[in-house]
Regions:
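Bacterial N-terminal signal peptides
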Residues: 6-17
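Histidine-rich, glycine-flanked metal-binding segment
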Residues: 34, 39-78, 99-100
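Metal-associated gating/positioning segment near the N- to mid-region
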Residues: 75-151, 224, 248, 252-256
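Histidine/acidic-residue-rich catalytic or RNA/ligand-binding cores of hydrolases
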Residues: 92-95, 140, 220, 250-256, ...
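Active-site mouth loops of central-metabolism enzymes
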Residues: 98-111, 174-197
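His/Asp/Glu-enriched, well-ordered alpha-helical/loop segment
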Residues: 100-101, 235-237, 308-394
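Divalent metal-dependent hydrolysis catalytic cores, especially in the metallo-beta-lactamase
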Residues: 112-138, 154-162, 205-217, 239, ...
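Alpha-helix-loop-beta-strand connector modules within alpha/beta enzyme cores
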Residues: 145-163, 220-245, 279, 283-287
Length: 419
């Protein structure tokens, strides 16, 4: 027994020594330019010192002699991108939603999520707020934990698990009343006690944040129900993201104390001013609508997408004018959308943001929105070494972010430039 304990202790000490040695490894990244997302300017040349998982220093003076180097050449390095609203478990067409829930196991959907997560990481998204797993139980918790354990590649994840919607007010619709146990895309609630139980259950099972559907074409959850969700989430130091498109739905979410509004398409000036006063974030999700317009195969679909984009463009002009804080989120729910999330950054520019503002919405400001500004969102000492590289100057051509050439996450290179 004593020999066994000695062996275990010896192995543990050796293991600690190996980890300590790895943590002391220093790498110096050289590139033509660094985008300082705080100052909004390029620094040339770029020198970033990485020690273990973290950024040790920035600038030539910080580079120690004899360190391992990565020479990236004529590229611009910048912080890893952040998507503030995705559905990684989503490989769903709306007209096949019920069929998907019936035919795909949660294990299979977790594997789909793993594939989508890897695709996003290689596209330069090193952090993701995944806001609703569309009926896959707690598979997103397993995905997050597997990434954190190093079992699979993927971004740093915050997950909202099942999301919460009013009874009968989320997909799939049109299910026979004879099938009360038919799987749903969100956890259905009715009444404040039901809401409280759902929030507590989701947090107990690993939710990093709570997602609520404040409306669906019209307000669904009441202010009282939303307030209970916010109360329970905030007690557990979780933020609340509210899906809301209507003025009434947005105002209900604001009255309840939600931390962010997802979509917000019909918000008027007064509502946006209230958001600004309360410091509530807006994630307008405009990029996927642009993509759907481009892919529309009928006059009816093109008209619908065109109308929605016009609404969104008007809302965005007001939001920018009154100073609402904006985070970038692509709302990817279809397989083809995962990894194409940088389209959202370009779409924000199409909707009136400057290129710097759009990039900040996917880096510096996104990190603040999700509560991780102490660890990601900028290339500066102390933050995780989550760094990407693109050709050219993204301040002049934001589409460069759709062609990421190099990705390092937590000091580990996951994508290298192809010669």
């Amino acid at each position: 027994m004593r020999r066994l304990l000695f062996t275990i202790a010896f192995v543990a000490l050796c293991g600690c020594g190996v980890r300590a040695t790895l943590a002391e490894d220093v790498t110096v990244i050289h590139a033509a330019r660094l985008l300082d997302v705080k100052a909004g300017r390029l620094i040339s040349p770029a020198v970033v010192v990485v020690k273990g998982e973290r950024i040790e220093g920035v600038g030539a003076a910080a580079a120690p002699s004899g360190a391992r180097t990565i020479e990236l050449g004529d590229v611009t390095v910048l912080p890893g991108l952040i998507d503030c609203h995705t559905h990684l478990m989503g490989d769903i067409q709306w007209d096949e939603y019920g069929t998907t829930l019936l035919t795909k196991s949660q294990a299979y959907r977790a594997l789909e999520g793993a594939a989508h997560a890897r695709r996003m990481l290689h596209a330069g998204f090193t952090t993701v707020s995944d806001e609703g797993n569309e009926g896959s139980g707690y598979a997103d918790v397993a995905l997050r934990d597997a990434i954190n354990a190093g079992l699979i590649e993927g971004p740093r994840l915050q997950v909202a698990t099942r999301a919460i919607a009013a009874l009968g007010q989320y997909q799939p619709f049109g299910v026979s009343p004879d099938l009360p146990d038919f799987p749903r895309g969100a956890q259905m609630v009715s009444g404040t006690d039901s809401v409280r139980r759902a929030v507590r259950e989701q947090i107990a099972n690993g939710a990093d944040l709570i997602k609520v559907y404040a409306d669906w074409d019209y307000p669904t959850l009441t202010v009282e129900e939303l307030s209970v969700a916010v109360e329970e989430a905030h007690k557990a130091k979780r933020r609340v993201a509210a899906h809301a498109t209507t003025v009434s739905g947005i105002r209900n979410a604001l009255a309840a104390g939600a931390d962010s509004i997802v979509h917000g398409w019909d918000a008027d000036r007064q509502t946006l001013e209230l958001m600004q006063q309360k410091g509530v974030w807006l994630v307008p999700t405009v990029g996927l609508s642009e993509s759907r317009l481009a892919q529309a195969d009928s006059a009816e679909e093109r008209a619908r997408c065109t109308k929605q984009l016009a609404r969104t463009r008007a809302m965005m002009a007001l939001a920018r004018e009154v100073g609402v804080r904006i985070g970038s989120g692509y709302d990817a729910i279809e397989a083809s959308a995962h990894g194409a999330n940088a389209r959202e950054i370009a779409a924000l520019v199409h909707h009136g943001l400057s290129t710097l503002e759009a990039i900040q919405a996917a880096t510096l400001h996104a990190a603040e929105m999700i509560g991780w500004s102490d660890r990601v969102g900028a290339v500066e000492p102390g933050k995780y070494a989550d760094i990407i590289a693109v050709s050219g100057n993204p301040l002049e051509d934001v589409a460069r972010l759709q062609q990421v050439r190099f990705v390092i996450k937590g000091g580990t290179v996951v994508k290298t430039p192809v010669p």
